[in-house]
Amino acid sequence: MDLKNKSAVILLSGGLDSSTVTGLAKASKAKIFGLSFDYGQRHKKELDSAFTIANHFEIEEFKIVKLDLSLWGGSSLTDIKKDLPIDGIQQNTIPNTYVPGRNTIFISVALSYAEAINADLIGLGVNALDYSGYPDCRPDYIKKFQELANLANKRGREENPIKLWTPLLDLNKEDIIQLAFDNNVPLEKTWSCYSGNLEPCGKCDSCRIRQTAYKKWQIKKNEN
């Protein structure tokens, strides 16, 4: 998608995927408006990373929205009484790191923000191939939310809809790492770990996915 002269609200968590989407948008000369959420998560390191990435790419604006989902919990990311899973990724199950309704809430806020500033796109780092089992990172979810977005606001009703831009949706994680390198993403400044320690734990699902992807990326790189 050609993003030159377009404006994009990007959900920027500070992780690998959203930072790569930001890098792609910057390389495409889009005007970028970053949006992060302080939603009662276990730690704020990802917000620090999001701020760092926003500064790195010199985006137009960066906002952090306070929205406390820990009020009702339901996830090990918002309820410290729940243990983070460290036994490896279980296939065909939704892990307890899933935050009920998180992407639906975040994208809805982004849609409001995008319409208010007359943005063209909402950039999302969702990835269907190497996702952690979350229901709101899948192609059918994105398709249906786009249909909802087209009906839910003035722009959509006037046949000038705000598009959900998901450039990573069908990519392997190792290909996303390559995209990150190709688009000047400072990977060392991104944060994927579910824990808020000084260093990534190396045990949670997010760390495992990233570690496995990096090993596969290294193998591909050595083969070329």
UniProtKB/Swiss-Prot annotation:
CDD domains: QueC-like. It catalyses: 7-carboxy-7-deazaguanine + NH4(+) + ATP = 7-cyano-7-deazaguanine + ADP + phosphate + H2O + H(+). ATP binds at residues 12-22. One of its GO terms (molecular function) is zinc ion binding. Pathway: Purine metabolism; 7-cyano-7-deazaguanine biosynthesis. Transmembrane segments: none annotated. It comes from the Bacteria. The keyword Cell membrane does not apply. Its EC number is 6.3.4.20. SUPFAM superfamilies: Adenine nucleotide alpha hydrolases-like (SSF52402). Its cofactor is Zn(2+). Zn(2+) binds at residues 193, 201, 204, 207. Binds 1 zinc ion per subunit. GO terms for biological process: queuosine biosynthetic process. It is an enzyme of class 6 (ligase). Keywords: ATP-binding, Ligase, Metal-binding, Nucleotide-binding, Queuosine biosynthesis, Zinc. Belongs to the QueC family. Catalyzes the ATP-dependent conversion of 7-carboxy-7-deazaguanine (CDG) to 7-cyano-7-deazaguanine (preQ(0)). This is 7-cyano-7-deazaguanine synthase. The gene is queC.
